[in-house]
Amino acid sequence: MKNIGSKAVIQALLEIDSVCVAELQPFFYTSGWASPIYLDTKGLFSDIARRSIVLNAATNLLKDFVQKKRIDAIVGIEGSGVPFAAWLADRLDMPFLYLRKRPIGWGIKAQIEGNISTNARVLVIDDVTTDAKSKVDACIALRNHGALIEDIFVLVNFDIYPQSESLLSDANLEIHSLVTWRELFAQLSLEEKLPIKKIKLIEDFNKDPITWSSSHGGVGKC
């Protein structure tokens, strides 16, 4: 499955102004990376038409995949991706589970809301992934509670951090997405909505996000 590069999804994301470009100071992700851009998909929450475009594309992509992989449940990770995971679980007529980033209390319910059986095959769904580390951590937490997991699905995969591939490979995981950041940026560039200075800033970031981060006050390794 990997990535389908849906033009309709790209357009929908651009129309809700999901790409936020830093003005004076870079954005700092929770992982510590500094970045000139931040992807915000929350505009889809209240935009029914564009939300439908994205969910239709995701549903069409996932409906055969979950059967082929014999997925038992969909898992949403605490954060802005939870609504998308819940909407897709509903469309796919599948159980939905909610995973907290950190446990609260004791036992399985401290981190997972919803009932999960040992050896259940689950699919993690989120809106965006940058370096994939938080997704890998989430999958490890699920495995510690007895779940079987091989795949992660996101709306947008940055797919520019070189260490992501080894992180995923070492954890026996694969990320699939509707679009990549490069595809989103390519269309944004064509629409000429950003000044040349910002385009160049983002191009420099895309070429070497690790060096860009460390030279702008962020971490320099995963």
Language model: regions and residue ranges:
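Active-site-facing substrate-recognition patch
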Residues: M1-F65
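PRPP-dependent phosphoribosyltransferase catalytic core
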Residues: K2-E15, I140-C222
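Conserved hydrophobic/aromatic pocket- or pore-lining residues that grip, position, or stack substrates
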Residues: G32, I74, F96
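Phosphate/pyrophosphate-binding loops at sites that engage ATP/ADP/AMP, CoA/4′-phosphopantetheine
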Residues: A58-I71, C139-L148
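Short glycine-rich phosphate-binding loop at a beta-alpha junction
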Residues: K68-E78, F153
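Conserved acidic residues
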Residues: D72, A120, E150
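Short, glycine/charge-rich flexible loops or terminal/linker lids adjacent to PRPP-binding catalytic cores
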Residues: F84-L123, D131-D137
